């Protein structure tokens, strides 16, 4: 992303505190250029957080927003970042992000806050794209950007994302039989609606969790899988052919350092892997995210050895979108796919580098939202720009989730028939 022929410079950088989908404050940044181009970006926030994520700076003033305010991060943009960026080149993203990293001066963005640096980083890219009259995905990725992502749609919420008895955080459907993104989205919406009818007919709650999926009180994971298969068939589709299932276990949330405790059971790492093997035999599950806790590296190794050729094993808390960790753990044979959350690392350039390193290791990359999100659709552009092939951005409800899906529909239309939707490859390829 180096467009040297433009003469526009950054002439304004500012930030404000707005609210995310959970009613908690987050950062919105505004970057303006000398030619009148403008970039406005707001950043998300997670509930299930990896311990190695870049720091999301919060005020910790318990008298306001329960300590979740971000006025310090906003002030860092307005008083520290803005003066250094005014009159600089907005088209050299790497140089701009390197400056943000230098201004912060820490390993985890703890001085300025990753919420501050990411907002400014992506807002600058958005302003630069506007200056060149390009969509953001085209500005970031160039002419080769045309692969639409297969959506992993979260239809049942559990864990930290819902107030029900399910320990696993997300139960997702993947429209593996779709030929276009618009078809994929339609198929998912139809299954989502049929699932709602099934839950109602069983007198189960159709209230939704943080990410828009239903949050019924179900007695077991097996019950969830059976209901999902019923919903797929009720919508007129075939499990394993039209749809597969995916999980976000978020195993770190029920791991005590030695044992996994969930659903009234206690399991070792080896027993967890055996449990997943049984699930994969019984149900069309092709993707498991954070099936092992981030600190249980031996467990990750065993999971990868035993299931890595059959199932997409996604590291979220394990990698936290950190290029160094992706390189290290991929070389050690842990996982076979990386979840990409830009706010875990704090700049657009580092996000791009994380995806590049994943690709070099023959890992899939899945671009992801966070449970506390905004209506900003920039991750949709990142997914297409870098031909990631998969996106995880919630369910078929809540407008902050639908904003990403609707933006992908616009991008597919903008590609004028050149867009492709590839099948999901499993394992290192």
UniProtKB/Swiss-Prot annotation:
Listed GO biological process terms: glycolytic process
Pathway note: Carbohydrate degradation; glycolysis; pyruvate from D-glyceraldehyde 3-phosphate: step 4/5
Active site: 211, 341
Free-text cofactor note: Binds a second Mg(2+) ion via substrate during catalysis.
Residues bound to (2R)-2-phosphoglycerate: 169, 341, 370-371, 392
Disulfides per UniProt: none
Ligand binding (Mg(2+)): 248, 289, 316
EC id: 4.2.1.11
Primary subcellular site in the record, as a coarse category: cytoplasm
Pfam families linked: Enolase_C, Enolase_N
InterPro entries in UniProt: Enolase (IPR000941), Enolase-like_C_sf (IPR036849), Enolase-like_N (IPR029017), Enolase_C (IPR020810), Enolase_CS (IPR020809), Enolase_N (IPR020811)
GO MF term set: magnesium ion binding; phosphopyruvate hydratase activity
Family of this protein: Belongs to the enolase family.
Function summary: Catalyzes the reversible conversion of 2-phosphoglycerate (2-PG) into phosphoenolpyruvate (PEP). It is essential for the degradation of carbohydrates via glycolysis.
This protein's name: Enolase
């Amino acid at each position: 992303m180096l467009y040297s022929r433009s003469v526009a410079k950054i002439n304004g950088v500012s930030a404000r505190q707005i609210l995310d989908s959970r009613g908690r404050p987050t950062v919105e940044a505004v970057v303006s250029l000398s030619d009148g181009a403008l970039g406005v970006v707001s950043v998300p926030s997670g509930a299930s957080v990896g311990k190695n994520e870049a720091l999301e700076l919060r005020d910790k003033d318990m008298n306001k927003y329960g300590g979740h305010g971000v006025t310090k991060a906003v002030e860092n943009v307005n008083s520290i970042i803005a003066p250094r960026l005014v009159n600089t080149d907005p088209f050299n993203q790497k140089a701009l992000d390197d400056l943000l990293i230098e201004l912060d001066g820490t390993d985890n963005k703890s001085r300025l806050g990753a919420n501050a640096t990411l907002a400014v980083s992506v807002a600058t890219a958005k302003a630069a794209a506007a200056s060149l009259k390009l969509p953001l995905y085209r500005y970031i990725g160039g002419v080769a950007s045309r692969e639409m992502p297969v959506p992993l749609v979260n239809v049942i919420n559990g864990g930290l994302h819902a107030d029900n008895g399910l320990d696993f955080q997300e139960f997702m459907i993947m429209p593996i039989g779709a030929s276009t993104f618009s078809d994929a989205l339609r198929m998912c919406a139809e299954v989502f609606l049929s699932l709602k009818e099934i839950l109602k007919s069983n007198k189960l709650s159709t209230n939704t969790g943080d990410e828009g999926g239903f949050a019924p009180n179900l007695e077991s994971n097996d019950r969830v899988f059976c209901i999902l298969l019923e919903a797929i068939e009720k919508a007129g589709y075939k499990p394993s052919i039209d749809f597969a299932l995916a999980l976000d276990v978020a195993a770190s949330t029920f791991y005590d350092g030695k044992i996994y405790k969930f659903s009234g059971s206690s399991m070792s790492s080896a027993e967890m892997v055996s449990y997943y093997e049984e699930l994969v035999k019984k149900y069309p599950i092709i993707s498991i995210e954070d099936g092992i806790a981030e600190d249980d590296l031996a467990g990750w190794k065993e999971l990868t050895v035993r299931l890595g050729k059959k199932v997409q094993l996604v590291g979220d808390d394990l990698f936290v979108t950190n290029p160094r960790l992706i390189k290290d753990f991929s070389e050690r044979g842990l996982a076979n796919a990386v979840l990409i959350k830009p706010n875990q690392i704090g700049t657009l350039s580092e996000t791009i580098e994380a995806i590049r390193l994943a690709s070099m290791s023959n890992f899939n990359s899945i671009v992801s939202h966070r449970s506390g999100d905004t209506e900003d659709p920039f991750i949709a552009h990142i997914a297409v720009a870098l031909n990631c092939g998969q996106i995880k951005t919630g369910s078929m409800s809540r407008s902050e989730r639908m904003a990403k899906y609707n933006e992908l529909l616009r991008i597919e239309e903008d590609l004028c028939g050149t867009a492709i939707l590839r099948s999901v490859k499993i394992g290192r390829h």
